[in-house]
A protein has these predicted regions:
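Glycine-rich phosphate-binding loops of nucleotide-dependent enzymes
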Residues: 2-191
Length: 191
């Protein structure tokens, strides 16, 4: 069974059919590319797969579960993470806190546990810090963990966005032009 099965997917904005009758099957453990000219609808497809846009036709099935039209939070919890063409970080938050945002969809403690900062909250926060630092180290961002995200150079901001997406522990990772705007050295470092 495919990890992701897309059938007859489409979306129209008013009278403009942006994507029509897209069929796609993605197997677990493989690398795929969605290639096309500017304006072909690649980002629109990513937006439908992640719940940013609701398709006007078709189905999206992830790991046997229909996720068509679900909101982005539920789709993220189901196992799809993404990056964006234009970097979308929390610029005034620290680098480590940006990664921890991705970890929060896996952490389970009640509202009162968090408000009162009970031992379970402190334990989970410590665990998230450890996991976030592991990811930052992989992307050579661990030394900048306490910087504001906006203080990082562009190439490192790209890496941070990928680290945050990976923090969700996705089944499927969608990278929307991950090297856009990067110089050749930054691109090579990313690969």
């Amino acid at each position: 069974m495919a990890l992701l099965e897309v059938s007859n997917l489409g979306i129209a904005f008013g009278g403009l059919q942006a994507v029509a009758q897209l069929d796609l099957s993605i197997e677990k453990g493989h690398l795929y590319g969605l290639i096309g000219p500017n304006g072909a609808g690649k980002t629109t497809v990513f937006n439908m797969l992640t719940g940013v846009y609701k398709p006007t036709e078709g189905n999206i099935v992830l790991d046997g579960k229909d996720i068509t039209g679900q909101n982005p939070e539920l789709i993220s919890k189901s196992g799809i993470a993404r990056t964006f063409q234009n970097i979308r970080l929390f610029n005034e938050m620290s680098v480590i806190d940006n990664v921890k945002v991705g970890l929060h969809n896996q952490i389970k403690y009640g509202m009162w546990t968090g408000i009162l900062r009970l031992p379970a909250f402190k334990e989970k926060e410590h665990e998230m810090n450890r996991e976030a630092m592991k990811l930052l180290k992989i992307f050579d961002l661990d030394k900048e963990a306490n910087y504001k995200a906006s203080q990082l150079p562009y190439g490192k901001q790209r890496k941070l966005e990928i680290a945050r997406a990976l923090a969700t522990n996705p089944k499927l990772l969608l990278l929307d032009e991950p090297a856009a705007g990067m110089n050749p050295n930054e691109t090579e470092e990313l690969m």
